């Protein structure tokens, strides 16, 4: 039950279209919320998510640390998103804290800057999307984290007149914000950076 990475490979290969992941997550949810039986390592992860807003318990203010390593300006959105900012770049936990993922974060930010795209980041206002909690069966914690982020998004886009467009590099953030949050009544136009993504002359993302 706990060895599954919820990658979806089994679902893609299943000849009768069984939704294995949904069943596995439901069983984990029962184990966590009803039986309180789960791997001890998850206890630390749950506490870190609850207290620090990331799986490792890192300082929330350190989400901005990668910006100091850039030789170009990066706008940190402190209040509502200005109309001139076209894209919100959602960095994510790994993109802010993990050294290898930070390289991707800086590369994407540089790509946006060099392409003349006006973008901004939330910095310390970000918190984990809740994907690790939901996948591990802690639906209660997921609801807390997701509502916090949805409230932040609503504040950011409170007076914004354009499309609500968000760039992400993390596939987990892409799925959670783009699909799971939509189930909670909140919808954004998601753009996932990948090798096949190109910027055309009007700065729109096409795959």
Model-derived features: where do they sit?
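Iron-sulfur-cluster electron-transfer modules
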Residues: 1-176, 180-185, 190
């Amino acid at each position: 039950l706990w060895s599954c990475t919820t990658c979806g490979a089994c679902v893609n290969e299943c000849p009768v279209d069984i939704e294995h992941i949904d069943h596995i997550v439901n069983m984990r949810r029962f184990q966590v919320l009803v039986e309180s039986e789960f791997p001890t390592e998850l206890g630390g992860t749950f506490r870190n998510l609850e207290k620090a807003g990331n799986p490792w318990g890192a300082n929330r203010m350190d989400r901005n640390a990668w910006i100091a390593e850039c030789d170009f300006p990066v706008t940190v959105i402190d209040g509502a998103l200005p109309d001139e900012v076209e894209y919100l770049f959602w960095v994510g936990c790994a993109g802010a804290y993990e050294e290898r993922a930070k390289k991707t974060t800086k590369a994407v930010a540089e790509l946006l800057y060099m392409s003349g795209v006006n973008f901004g980041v939330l910095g310390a206002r970000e918190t984990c999307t809740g994907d690790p909690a939901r996948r591990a069966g802690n639906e209660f914690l997921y609801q807390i984290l997701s509502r916090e982020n949805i409230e932040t998004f609503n504040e950011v886009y409170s007076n914004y007149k354009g499309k609500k467009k968000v760039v992400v590099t993390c596939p987990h953030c892409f799925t959670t914000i783009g699909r799971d949050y939509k189930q909670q009544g909140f919808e954004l136009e998601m753009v996932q950076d990948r090798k096949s993504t190109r910027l055309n002359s009007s700065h729109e993302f096409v795959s």
